[in-house]
């Protein structure tokens, strides 16, 4: 599993180098692309190049909406899926509702519920969600299970102030087993 964050593609040079490198990854490598809040700063050519190779594109609702507007402005009617392979998946983070997974272009959207917890701070929650999802994939889980892990990690991340510390594997597994989120600082 290789993760490329759009925040690393905000300069023309970095966008070109990173998107072309990622596009050249061998097929046995799972490429996860995260859209990031810097979506408008990424050159369109980089999106076109990297989406054509991506296995999973993950984004927040705001990032998805912003990117959709950029792509449509460039090519009337274009969507994120226009640039992706039909067999690639999308994961959209929808805040307190968890995330939505579409495993391939014509697949139904699967809602993966969040774990309920009082929200102390949302700093770093997107990064935690992406990292937990990638960890699940590395551990050999299917994407739906990896997204459930990501939701558990995200719930732990928002349970305390600050983006640090990030949840441990044991803490995530405890949430998955019990459904209960506890403040990881206690």
Please name every model-derived segment.
Residues 1-78, 97-98:
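Conserved beta-alpha-beta core of the PfkB/ribokinase-like small-molecule kinase fold
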Residues 24, 70-186:
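Conserved phosphate-binding/catalytic region of the ribokinase-like
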């Amino acid at each position: 599993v290789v993760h490329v964050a759009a925040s690393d593609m905000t300069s023309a040079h970095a966008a070109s180098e990173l998107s072309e490198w990622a596009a050249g990854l061998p097929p046995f490598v799972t490429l996860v692309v995260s859209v990031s809040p810097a979506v408008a700063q990424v050159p369109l050519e980089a999106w076109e190049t990297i989406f054509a190779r991506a296995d999973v594109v993950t984004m927040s609702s705001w990032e998805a909406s912003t990117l959709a507007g950029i792509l449509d402005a460039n090519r009337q009617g274009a969507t994120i899926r226009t640039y992706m392979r039909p067999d690639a998946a999308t994961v959209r983070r929808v805040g307190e509702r968890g995330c939505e997974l579409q495993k391939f272009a014509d697949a139904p959207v699967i809602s993966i519920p969040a774990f309920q917890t009082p929200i102390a701070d949302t700093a770093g929650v997107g990064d935690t969600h992406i990292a937990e999802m990638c960890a699940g994939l590395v551990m050999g889980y299917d994407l739906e299970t990896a997204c459930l892990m990501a939701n558990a990690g995200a719930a732990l991340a928002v349970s305390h102030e600050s983006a640090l510390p990030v949840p441990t594997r044991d803490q995530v597994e405890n949430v998955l087993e019990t459904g209960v989120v506890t403040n990881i600082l206690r």
